[in-house]
Curated annotation (Swiss-Prot):
Pathway annotation from the record: Lipid metabolism; malonyl-CoA biosynthesis; malonyl-CoA from acetyl-CoA: step 1/1
InterPro entries hit by this protein: Acetyl_CoA_COase_a_su, ClpP/crotonase-like_dom_sf, COA_CT_C
Main location: cytoplasm
tRNA-binding as UniProt keyword: no
Species of origin: Picosynechococcus sp. (strain ATCC 27264 / PCC 7002 / PR-6) (Agmenellum quadruplicatum)
Family annotation (SUPFAM superfamilies): ClpP/crotonase
EC number: 2.1.3.15
This protein's UniProt keywords: ATP-binding, Cytoplasm, Fatty acid biosynthesis, Fatty acid metabolism, Lipid biosynthesis, Lipid metabolism, Nucleotide-binding, Transferase
PANTHER family: ACETYL-COENZYME A CARBOXYLASE CARBOXYL TRANSFERASE SUBUNIT ALPHA, ACETYL-COENZYME A CARBOXYLASE CARBOXYL TRANSFERASE SUBUNIT ALPHA, CHLOROPLASTIC
Family: Belongs to the AccA family.
GO molecular function: acetyl-CoA carboxylase activity; ATP binding; carboxyl- or carbamoyltransferase activity
Described purpose of this protein according to its UniProt entry: Component of the acetyl coenzyme A carboxylase (ACC) complex. First, biotin carboxylase catalyzes the carboxylation of biotin on its carrier protein (BCCP) and then the CO(2) group is transferred by the carboxyltransferase to acetyl-CoA to form malonyl-CoA.
UniProt-recorded name of the protein: Acetyl-coenzyme A carboxylase carboxyl transferase subunit alpha
Record note on quaternary structure: Acetyl-CoA carboxylase is a heterohexamer composed of biotin carboxyl carrier protein (AccB), biotin carboxylase (AccC) and two subunits each of ACCase subunit alpha (AccA) and ACCase subunit beta (AccD).
């Protein structure tokens, strides 16, 4: 989608920058209509816009990062697939009677290499979000994902997963259909796959819903994505009986890419364009593609046995604790 369309939804902290950019466009249009040279003034305003952009996006709080991760115009799995893959053929169904639209996947050609690309898929508007259950997969979604990963393993195709979900569907029907079992099965099986697995958090990485496709040789995060055991709203409601304290919870949960890199939960932070992924989706896709290419080339040099061993050790070492003296 064009950048202008992605600017129609503004977060509060983006508004000063948007107003300045609108002013620059107005001056440029008026100057063109009246054949007036305002290049010096435009240059000064653009310098101010660059400075303001840096001030805004370099000092974001965890709660503001969460807003960006949930931005309705933020690129989705399908957006990245379309921008990064040379070819794409979607595969459907879990072979158990369902085809969950909240988790999509298919065979693609990435940088000349056949791969399996799969991930959570949110909607673009209310109707689409309802159809895709707001990116919250049912058990069938995780079983479909595992079927596709088994297929990739059988044919020697690397697996690229894209994580963007507030969590797995927590409805009664999901529990009846074995939500916990479906996610646990994926966790176990992903450790045993021979092919390289690269997982990227592109928006929200919520709880077990994220982990269900999140066991990889490399786990990447876009700079303004989040990865958390529970949404800050849920955490605040549980700890303080007040969902209004979500901002406090967001800070305590350590949900940002920088926090998770320091804790060695993730391997790499993928930078975003100056105005973030929702404002420049093509730029974001180029940066992500380069990061995946580098990691994939490194992983392809390892034997399957070595990849499995390192993958297992990577997750075994997660977590720290303090001992009293």
């Amino acid at each position: 989608m064009p950048k202008t369309e992605r600017r129609t939804f503004l977060l509060d902290f983006e508004k000063p920058l948007s107003e300045l950019e609108s002013r620059i466009h107005q001056i440029r249009d008026l100057a063109a209509e009246n054949n007036v040279d305002v290049s010096e003034q435009i240059q000064q305003l653009e310098a101010r816009a660059d400075q303001l952009r840096e001030e805004i996006f370099s000092t974001l709080t965890p709660a503001q990062r969460l807003q960006l991760a949930r931005h309705p115009r933020r690129p989705s799995t399908l957006d990245y697939v379309q921008m990064m893959a040379d070819e794409w053929f979607e595969l459907h169904g879990d072979r158990g009677g369902s085809d969950d639209p909240a988790l999509i996947g298919g065979v693609a050609r990435f940088d000349g290499q056949p791969v399996m690309m799969l991930g959570h898929q949110k909607g673009r508007d209310t109707k689409d979000n309802v159809a895709r259950n707001f990116g919250m997969p049912a058990p069938g979604g995780y079983r479909k994902a595992m079927r596709l990963m088994d297929h990739a393993n059988r044919f020697g195709m690397p697996i690229l997963t894209f994580i963007d979900t507030p969590g797995a569907w927590a409805g009664l029907e999901a529990e009846k259909l074995g939500q916990g079992e479906a996610i646990a099965f994926n966790l176990r099986e992903m450790f045993s796959l021979d092919v390289p697995i690269i997982c990227t958090v592109i928006g929200e990485g919520g709880s077990g819903g994220a982990l269900g496709i999140g066991v990889g040789d490399r786990v990447l995060m876009l700079k303004n994505s989040v990865y958390t055991v529970a949404t800050p709203e849920a955490c605040a409601a549980i700890l303080w009986k007040d969902a209004g304290k979500s901002e406090q919870a967001a800070a305590a949960l350590k949900i940002t890419a920088e926090d998770l890199k320091s804790l060695e939960i993730i391997d790499e932070i993928v930078p975003e364009p100056a105005s973030c992924a929702h404002a420049d989706p093509i730029g974001a896709a180029q940066l992500l593609k380069a990061a995946i290419q580098d990691n994939l080339q490194a992983l392809l040099k390892l034997t399957p046995e070595r990849r499995r061993e390192l993958r297992y050790q990577r997750f075994r070492k997660i977590g720290v604790f303090l001992e009293s003296s």
